[in-house]
Structures are given as structure tokens and as C-alpha cells.
Amino acid sequence: MVTKEQRRQKIKARVRGKISGTQEKPRLTVFRSNKQIYAQLIDDIAGRTLASASSLKLEMTGSKKEIAAKVGDEIAKAATEAGISTVVFDRNGYLFHGRIKELADAARKGGLKF
């Protein structure tokens, strides 16, 4: 029987074969744990992280969805400071629902296009 984590890893590998980030259009990848949420802008060609934001850095209170939205705002601010306006969204095998959706919507409101 395939567990949820094995399913996510399988989807992640399949999607990563199809999308890649560049300097001009980096990959916005999201990692979600039970308590925290992390977002990174990655240039896959150079193998560098251009910007990052996480709920650990912000030390916020509120619901998990509210915190995810704040992380989305922070990654959008970091991207505009780095001169990035368009990204490729990598949900990392997670369903586009709940905290992942909140982060993506907040990043879009912050000015990122994907």
C-alpha cells in the first residue's frame, strides 16, 4: 500500500522532471510540515536559492492558513527586492488546497505572476 508521503514523492519527481527555474523565471517551491511552512525561489540552472521565507523566520501567531498567507506576502516582497516578477510555481507534490493555496494567493496579491 502506498502511503501519502510516497504518493507525494512520486508526484514531486514527476513534476520536477517537467519544470525548471531560471534566473529570470525562478521556481517557487513550497515545503509544508505539520507546524511550519517554507517557500524558496530557486534558480535550477545555477543551483542557487535566490530568496526564501518561512514561518520560522517570521515567528507569527494565528491559524496555519493565516501564517501561510503571511509567508506568501514575504516571499513576494523578497522577490520584488531581487527584481523577480514571474515565477514557476512548484507545489512539491502537495494538493493545491489549504495552506498551499493561501501561500500562492498571497504571493499573487504581492505581485508575483505564475
UniProtKB/Swiss-Prot annotation:
Molecular function in Gene Ontology: 5S rRNA binding; structural constituent of ribosome
GO CC term, one of those recorded: cytosolic large ribosomal subunit
Highest taxon above the source species: Bacteria
InterPro entries linked: Ribosomal_uL18_bac-type, Ribosomal_uL18_bac/euk
Record keywords, A-Z: Ribonucleoprotein, Ribosomal protein, RNA-binding, rRNA-binding
GO BP annotations listed: translation
Family per similarity comment: Belongs to the universal ribosomal protein uL18 family.
Function: This is one of the proteins that bind and probably mediate the attachment of the 5S RNA into the large ribosomal subunit, where it forms part of the central protuberance.
Subunit-level organization: Part of the 50S ribosomal subunit; part of the 5S rRNA/L5/L18/L25 subcomplex. Contacts the 5S and 23S rRNAs.
Name of the protein this chain belongs to: Large ribosomal subunit protein uL18
Record organism: Porphyromonas gingivalis (strain ATCC BAA-308 / W83)
Source species taxonomy: Bacteria, Pseudomonadati, Bacteroidota, Bacteroidia, Bacteroidales
